[in-house]
């Protein structure tokens, strides 16, 4: 009898935990939806002149600064095709630069772009976090012409300047060989699927528990 009671407690405890996890995912779903709405509203506002006090993502900005004679080519797949994001640093002040994502270029155009001098055009775009390297991202190889990730510390050393913590994603047109970026918010929002999974697991557990109790 004591063994049955112990298993009862285990089933109840497990079901409670799984239901809590499902409910937590629902809370996260509403929170993420609110965040996406706020960010979409930011992109509907008029552009502001870029300044160092901007610390939020998806703020529309215009940048009229001098670009450095330096280019980074970041490995990036576009619609399944291998290519590169073209990243160029722009001077914010004497000690700081901001990185600008100019857009995407095909692999066979990279040598041409290396020789291209970009004029000090007014950049229109929006702010975004600089993507951090994850466990599955290969290490950068100095022998290669492109990067797998932007390594802030090493880049600051090579430029001898601080890097503004947000990237500017340029949406205005630039070189004819570069496919410009779009205004888009890329935030994963799979919390509904996760919640359904947890609730389904709870339902299966309850059915199994009732079947077990009937047999006991």
Identify the function of each model-found stretch.
Residues 1-50, 58-216:
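Surface-exposed, charge/polar-rich loops and edge strands
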